[in-house]
Amino acid sequence: MGQKVNPHGFRLGITTDFKSRWYADKLYKDYVKEDVAIRRMMTKGMERAGISKVEIERTRDRVRVDIHTARPGIVIGRRGAEADRIRGELEKLTGKQVQLNILEVKNPEVDAQLVAQAVAEQLSSRVSFRRAMRKSMQSSMKAGAKGIKIQCGGRLGGAEMSRSEFYREGRVPLHTLRANVDYGFFEAKTTFGRIGVKVWIYKGDVKNIAEVRAENAAARAGNRPARGGADRPAGRGGRGGERGGRGRKPQQSPAAEAPKADAAAAPAAESTGTEA
């Protein structure tokens, strides 16, 4: 049943974070409706921009929108004209001041949403679906992915009856919660109808989301996260930092060990002399 669940929602709070960060009580439904409208606006007129995801963060009088895109030049436009137009439409939609941030996706071959869009564009250009799937899989594996699965569903090749086919390469765990599995979906518009493209990309195991947030905050502050060890306070009965591990002997410096070695060697020399 792992194939029926969206990997982002399945691992939410464990290895993935929320794409909308705000709190509301009575205005909850209005904010959800605005978020859907914002994301629909970003994907409707910018198919060529390669938008991976849109993150929304709200405060009392401001809305921050982060657009992750593979082609930031298309989103920004000439001298920032396109970015100003988007900001104006967002302010008109939300009625608040909008802070627009355009972020570049460094490795688009490993982003599931961008891979799904690339396959859909090839299907719209009448490229064979098998060739499009295999080409995208090869480029993703060369870019560093540990596993990838691509599935296309619809009237494949213009067939009268719709079906779905998938290709998989590498390892794609669907039920392992610590696995960093990216998921993307896009629809290709063809002359025979729409073809849905789903992409799963496995990038390796990650830590807990709380540890990741703590490490990122420590890195921004320039301090390393403190770890428990020999400097921790004493516990019950005064047993504290000296208990580094059971069965371990306390380490001594080489300077302290040298007199003990000389003292042990002196009686041995005396005993050999008496026997002679």
UniProtKB/Swiss-Prot annotation:
SUPFAM superfamilies recorded: Prokaryotic type KH domain (KH-domain type II), Ribosomal protein S3 C-terminal domain
GO terms for MF: mRNA binding; rRNA binding; structural constituent of ribosome
Biased composition (Basic and acidic residues): 229-245
Biased composition (Low complexity): 216-228, 254-269
KH type-2 domain ranges (all copies): 38-106
Region entry Disordered, spans: 216-276
Keywords assigned: Ribonucleoprotein, Ribosomal protein, RNA-binding, rRNA-binding
Entry GO terms, CC: cytosolic small ribosomal subunit
Gene3D superfamilies (UniProt xref): 3.30.300.20, Ribosomal protein S3, C-terminal domain
Stored Pfam families: KH_2, Ribosomal_S3_C
Key word Transport present: no
GO BP annotation list: translation
Domain of life, per lineage: Bacteria
Alphabetized PANTHER family for the sequence: 30S/40S RIBOSOMAL PROTEIN S3, SMALL RIBOSOMAL SUBUNIT PROTEIN US3C
Protein purpose: Binds the lower part of the 30S subunit head. Binds mRNA in the 70S ribosome, positioning it for translation.
Family, as annotated: Belongs to the universal ribosomal protein uS3 family.
Assembly notes: Part of the 30S ribosomal subunit. Forms a tight complex with proteins S10 and S14.
Record-given protein name: Small ribosomal subunit protein uS3
Species annotation: Streptomyces griseus subsp. griseus (strain JCM 4626 / CBS 651.72 / NBRC 13350 / KCC S-0626 / ISP 5235)
Lineage: Bacteria, Bacillati, Actinomycetota, Actinomycetes, Kitasatosporales
